[in-house]
């Protein structure tokens, strides 16, 4: 083992241990059973199908976890973590949403189930021309109180009626009642129950938490600078894509750029995004209008999404093509392993090394993230928010979470690392600005792009999110300079999988925990292929053309790259003596 690899292994063990013990500080999780089995949720919903006056036998259903994020953010910023956790076990902030639909029937049925309390609400879509009764206010209120008491066990007679609305239709009257009460005597937290009566039938009971309008306005004011900085950073990243496109055009005229590998990279992005969208079954189900074919609705959603997917795919195409051209004019080709990876030549030594180093580097990145977040959490007013939020729901709301998380975060790592490191890092080295500039300048943009992602720690102050992500970007920048592009792509992928399997690892289901561990280990698959291939070749007593202990792919050109050009070493490129 080389000295640098031994140091990487040691750093990964230390940083990984620090990362694991600090997960509760980095991403504290709501103390609720958020990963309830879908069949159990369906059974709970079917027990109350009489509430919607509909036999749901033969209906299709999907379930997903939803969160009232404004309510959660307000609770966290106005009381202690322990108080917030206690309130989450009582208030409708995290809810399981179970939706039923039947082809040809326009009336979708939805149930809301609290992870700890059971059924807390329901809805049955009702057309305006459906006939019904016209009740007076007293009869309507009695019907509402009886339905809520029968199915939820909640006595609304002790709640304050804040609003009543009547909507006169041709064939019935619709009435809406809004009740409120304090969550506890003397508490400033108020629960709200909105009940919709269609004729004489209670068609919706929707609980919520009342968030003070003044707090919402204050949050909107705070977001202006945050959103401006993020927009500027995204503009710079998009400009990098334009620069890569222009350099690609120049390189095509000089015969430096092929189209096969860039096309594979772009196609991979489109495939990963499309497959990720397809695997989010509850979202596809939610968008389905049951008056039309379900397959046609899903196909339309996927096709519409593919239009937006073309932009990141085009950027990857340009990043790969421009970076290959830059590599050909440099004495060290940092894209060979990436090219072999995209061509599925995983038996290559370079791919195997990048897989192992990338996985270890992912643990180091987790340690850097943990240490930086701890430092930022000491800033006055700092807050690390409860999870799950944002991308965490991708894994929680899919029947194939391992596959979805692997595909979705692979395309993210591909787009970002090819842009920030493979293209921008190569370009800065080409301009002779030095290694520090190549590692740090793209990392600053990378950190600013993520300043608006509130699920990243710390949530407050917003600018504190830039520091941990920037430091991780600098780490990956130096890893790119020391090793190659594939190493940082796989490291980014591994780090994301560590983070966003967090809630699945805490599941009570052992199979869910096992699949989460398997998902985290997916970036090691290329290394497993390379090692297994070498073991097979040894059993067949064949000579190994690429000794495992050598980094031959870092010392020269990709044999598949044409034409082979004479190169002049730059001031920041290592010499043969320094590599030895």
Model-derived regions: residue spans:
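Intracellular C-terminal tails of type I single-pass membrane proteins
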Residues: 578-580
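Membrane-interfacial, low-structure loops and terminal tails that flank and connect transmembrane helices
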Residues: 291-292, 328-354, 427-429, 539-573
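Soluble extramembrane regions of membrane proteins in the secretory/endomembrane system
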Residues: 16, 26-234
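Hydrophobic membrane-insertion alpha-helices, especially the h-region
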Residues: 7-21
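Core alpha-helical transmembrane segments of integral membrane proteins
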Residues: 218-409, 413-418
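Membrane-interfacial loop-to-transmembrane alpha-helix junctions, especially the N-terminal start
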Residues: 4-9, 254-269, 330-331, 435-439, ...
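Transmembrane helix-loop-helix hairpins at the membrane interface
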Residues: 382-547
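Hydrophobic alpha-helical transmembrane segments in integral membrane proteins
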Residues: 23-31, 371-378, 534-539
